[in-house]
Amino acid sequence: MAHCFGRLFWYLEKGDGSMALWGGRFEAGVAEVTQEFGASLPVDKHLYKQDIAGSKAHAKMLAAQGIISAEDEQAIAKGLTGIEQDIDAGNFTFDINDEDIHMSIESELTRRIGEAGKRLHTGRSRNDQVATDTRLGVKALAKELMEANLELRHVLVDAAKKYDKVILPGYTHMQHAQPVLLSHHLLAYSWMFARDFTRLKAAFDAADNCPLGAAALAGTSYPLNRQMTAAELGFADVIPNSLDAVSDRDFLLDLHYAGSVMAMHLSRLSEEIVLWSSSEFGFITLSDSYSTGSSIMPQKKNPDFAELIRGKSGRVYGNLVQLLVTMKGLPLAYNKDLQEDKEGALDTARTLMQCLSVMAGMISTWTVNEDAMARECGVGHLAATDVADYLAKRGLPFREAHAVVGHLVLMCEKRGCNLEDLPFEVFQEASPLFERDITEALDIPSIVAARTTEGGTAPAAVAVQLQRAEAQLVVDEGVFGSLTKVVEMGHGAK
């Protein structure tokens, strides 16, 4: 233990015998087991670029306000740049005894540039520092997810264009319901992911306010220019309440929620891929690049990656629930519990980036088996609703028409045939309103073509919908391109 008063106010012996940066009030070092238990460095080291950017902006503002000298600010900026370059290159060794990314960088900065490094933390607490790092990180993660979201939507729209004449059964309760265009089905997912993009943008916006200057919880007596720091870091504004600034994690929950809904959409699509690629359906054949085999059954071609995407949704949901439970009992302002806020967010973003990329690859390389889809359109009485509509359009109340066609379906099931297989005489016996043109109501392409309402599955309606989906992509790409300055995630922290 160093007893020099000039060091004691700033350092405290850590578990390894070196000094901590917060220890003036303590006489004993932390236990070795708590040193590792309390350290957040294994997680928050991935925010090193955000931490360095925040420190540069803070130092620049301190110099502009006359709180530190221009020479100190220049030394700090140069030192931080050198540290960032070393981390980027994989030439920086993180020490668990430094506790977190803030202490790791600050202690190394002080080692490199001396006294000026000790002035960096003037007017700042780790509470507002970590909140700033995390907000910058969420903006970067949301942006990455938005970009991957756009890429998947392009794949879906391209597939919808390619398969604009392919018809397959639509399902309710996993039972044959009505025929739809495959393009219509794929566009349904495109719209789901379009809503996800909007939620991701909302999470980005929720994080786009700067906590720096809130200090520990009550603000500071230094004449800080919070607006300058916020602008330097690309934030839209400052957070108006210092207590809220250091303790709010709603923006992280927004990212988790947006990610969870998107994971749910990915899981639903994955479930259909698993079903469609099965022998029972045979609607699609997955590329070998997106399938695996069995260690014992030579014939197997498994949709493992679709299943993994489906399974990983639970992991993403768990991260959302974890943070909700962590937050629900915290009084104002900062509590150490908040250290648990970052690992789940990083995991969710990494998981979803992989899922979005794999899904895009699966769809862009699959083979659609049009004959299998057409075959299934010939079973399950997909024309039943249109036969009922045929009678209703001729004056029979729809509920009575429904009963008539239900009786015909029952007759088909007893005979082991479909509605289109019934002789015309059987239709006339069921209702004198049936005429020879009933065959048009039984024709699958005609049924699809008749669904001309806005948002319907008729080719003409789907063509309009496709234009809207493409236009929405253009709008969202514009939104993506106009995002405020973002400190991108670094990949040098090993």
Model-derived segments and their meaning:
Residues 135, 139-146, 150, 157, ...:
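Short amphipathic alpha-helical segments with heptad-repeat character
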Residues 18-54, 115-116, 297-494:
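Glycine-rich cofactor/substrate-binding loops
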Residues 15-219, 224-231, 292-293, 304, ...:
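A helix-coil-helix interface module used to build multimeric assemblies
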Residues 234-325:
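Acidic, glycine-rich loop-and-beta core segments that form the ion-binding/anion-interacting portion
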